[in-house]
Curated annotation (Swiss-Prot):
Enzyme Commission numbers on file: 3.4.11.9
Family membership: Belongs to the peptidase M24B family.
UniProt cross-references to InterPro entries, sorted A to Z: Creatin/AminoP/Spt16_N, Creatinase/aminopeptidase-like, Creatinase_N, Pept_M24, Pept_M24B, Peptidase_M24_C, Peptidase_M24B_aminopep-P_CS, X-Pro_aminopeptidase_P
Residues the record lists as binding Mn(2+) 1: D402, E500, E514
Entry keyword Metal-binding: yes
Protein name in UniProt: Probable Xaa-Pro aminopeptidase P
Role description: Catalyzes the removal of a penultimate prolyl residue from the N-termini of peptides.
Cofactor(s) recorded in Swiss-Prot or TrEMBL: Mn(2+)
Encoding gene, per UniProt annotation: ampp
Keywords annotated in UniProt: Aminopeptidase, Hydrolase, Manganese, Metal-binding, Metalloprotease, Protease
GO biological process terms held by the UniProt record: proteolysis
Organism annotation: Pyrenophora tritici-repentis (strain Pt-1C-BFP)
Reactions the enzyme catalyzes: Release of any N-terminal amino acid, including proline, that is linked to proline, even from a dipeptide or tripeptide
Superkingdom: Eukaryota
Length: 594
């Protein structure tokens, strides 16, 4: 994970800023984490990121950059930092297509208070700096997600959306999130690595539905699937079309009624908001498509169960192989060797479509980098005497997986065992909770942290994220954590979410245990307030590392819960190892009763 020299890029960007009378611009960096926001002035550069990436950012950013650690006391937010730089009439520029309308409004207000100006620049200056180095946009074909996996036809999904538009008295809805477009039309793509989506927009009104996509990406079976019910328009036509459509529908609307508006997701871009006519003509809301997508139907839930059984078998085969290579064969393997072997094993299983994210194969101190990505030639050799953390997942035609297991192949330290067991206890506590309908992931987060907190320990990431069905491995709007958004959406039957507490000591080791769980209705002796009560069903089928468990910290009830889980893991995955004695013996050992 080498530092990236950004001096030339920054110099080129600052030259473009000067030509366009822009004093401050967002964003460019040499940072590869999935969550970061960068701001460049004529003499400064700052990157803001959350606790998952502090360690990674410190390793990757060169001396040109100031790192703003989100959530740390006395560290300004990136908005505050930007507004401070704008003091005295400075102009802050941004490509409006890469910032949400809501974020743009908030930042514009802060900048205005400091006497500055927030300005949309329709050409992306970062792209101009990137120029010929920028990879070509993918041209892979779109595929149909058959109803045997999706259950519900796209016509029915569009009808449901129109009912929501009618309730809200809206002129139409612009679908701007790629996974929402894919889900709505029962289509999948491969334009974004690991995410089966394709570059697209969609516009649905009470009488029409239009898909904006490069038509060359649509083979005949996709066109037949869509039929004559859907209009296909070029991807680049979206902004011009919605401007014209918005004007036409507003002019045709009844002037005696309350003025109807276009509906957009609260994650839609400022550029889309502007194209529709601005705040006066747009109502931002949590996406009704995203809400529907997050509630899986029974076919999708069964697909998630089945793909996690296959994926669990792949992980057990990999962990058995890795232990044998390191301990018995004394092999020298680096972190990428491990990740490559795991992918090779996964590929053998039915309906495998690819990985769902870069495999985090990390040994020792690298395991403390929460979203670590090993690179060949730069990564570490796997040390059998150190913690090994593997966070990985796959895309299958019937579902998406994401599992983290932390292992030790020799003799862990007392602290490693204690930390692992505290994390495991938190993982189980969350999975076993029962809660009334209407409870949010924000309210449940502390359950996973309680045993760490009791020791004065914690972790700097959320406890859970939603997961798609052969879609994005990180899916909103639900999640479990302390983010404000997780306090706004209740967990519902059919949601699939991760349960992944952890603990990390920079420069030493990292621990994370992640199971995928599904929200279901549960029986309780009473139903206070006449509300249904909900709980979780685990679908991950991979053993915990018994070598890292401090049995003295577990209650008898917790041991019973683990034993029942391991019995289920063995019963559901052992059939894959009838001709694989090595993995079968490993699985028997790891799932033996505590």
């Amino acid at each position: 994970m080498a530092k990236v020299d950004t001096s030339h890029r920054l110099a080129e960007l600052r030259k473009l800023m000067k030509e366009r009378n822009v004093d401050i611009y967002t964003y460019i960096s040499g940072f590869t984490g999935s969550a970061g926001y960068a701001v460049i002035t004529h003499d400064k550069a700052a990157l803001s990121t959350d606790g998952r990436y502090f360690n990674q950012a410190e390793k990757q950013l060169d001396s040109n950059w100031e790192l703003l650690k989100q959530g740390i006391q006395d560290v300004p937010t990136i908005q505050e930092w930007t507004a401070d730089q704008a003091e005295g009439g400075k102009v802050v520029g941004v490509d409006p297509s890469v910032v949400t309308a809501g974020d743009a409004r908030k930042l514009a207000e802060k900048i205005k208070k400091k006497g500055g100006e927030y300005k949309a620049i329709d050409e992306n200056l970062v792209d101009l700096v990137w120029s010929s180095e920028r990879p070509a946009r993918p041209s892979e074909k779109v595929i149909v997600q058959p109803e045997r996996y999706a259950c519900k036809g796209f016509e029915d999904k569009i009808d449901d959306l129109r009912k929501e538009l009618e309730k809200k008295k809206s002129l139409g809805f612009v679908v701007s999130m790629l996974d929402e477009v894919a889900w709505l039309f029962n289509l999948r793509g491969s334009d974004i690595p690991y995410n089966p989506v394709f570059f697209s927009y969609a516009v649905v009104t009470p009488t029409a539905a239009t898909l904006y996509v490069d038509e060359n990406k649509l083979p005949e079976d996709v066109k037949e699937h869509l039929g004559n019910k859907i209009t296909i328009r070029p991807y680049e036509a979206i902004f011009g079309d919605v401007t014209a459509l918005s004007k036409e529908l507003f002019e045709a609307s009844d002037k005696n009624e309350t003025q109807k508006k276009f509906l957009t997701s609260n994650r839609a871009s400022w550029a889309l908001n502007k194209a529709l006519g601005g705040d006066d003509k747009v109502e931002e809301t949590r996406s009704p498509v995203g809400d529907s997508k997050a509630v899986k139907n029974e076919v999708e839930l069964e697909g998630m169960r089945q793909c996690h059984i296959r994926d669990g078998a792949a992980l057990s085969e990999y962990f058995a192989w890795l232990e044998d290579q390191l301990i018995n064969k004394k092999a020298t393997l680096d972190e990428v060797d491990g990740a490559d072997k795991l992918e090779e094993i996964r590929k053998k299983h039915d309906m495998f479509m690819g990985l769902s994210f870069d495999t985090i194969s990390s040994t020792g101190a690298n395991a403390a980098v929460i979203h670590y990505k090993p690179e060949k030639g730069e990564c570490a050799t796997i040390d059998p005497k150190a913690i090994y953390l593997c966070d990985s997942g796959a895309q299958y035609r019937d579902g998406t997986t994401d599992t983290t297991r932390t292992l030790h192949f020799t003799e862990p330290t007392e602290m490693e065992r204690k930390a692992y067991t505290l994390v495991l206890k938190g993982n189980m506590a969350l999975e076993r909770v029962k809660f009334p309908k209407g409870t949010t992931g924000f309210a449940l987060d502390a359950l996973a942290r309680q045993f760490l907190w009791a020791e004065g320990l914690d972790y700097r990431h959320g406890t859970g994220h939603g997961v798609g069905s052969f879609l994005n491995v990180h899916e909103g709007p639900i999640g479990i954590g302390t983010r404000v958004q997780y306090s706004e959406v209740s967990l519902a039957v059919g949601n699939v979410v991760s349960d992944e507490p952890g603990y990390y000591e920079d420069g030493k080791f990292g621990i994370r245990i992640e199971n995928m769980v599904m929200v279901k209705e549960v029986e309780t002796k009473h139903k206070f307030g006449d509300k249904p009560y909900l709980g979780f069903e685990h679908v991950t089928m991979t053993p915990h590392c018994r070598n890292l468990v401090d049995m003295s910290l577990l209650t008898e009830d917790e041991k019973k819960f683990i034993n029942e889980y391991h019995k289920e893991v063995y019963e559901k995955t052992s059939k894959y190892f009838e001709n694989d004695a090595l993995t079968l013996e490993w699985l028997k050992r790891e799932t033996a009763p505590y």
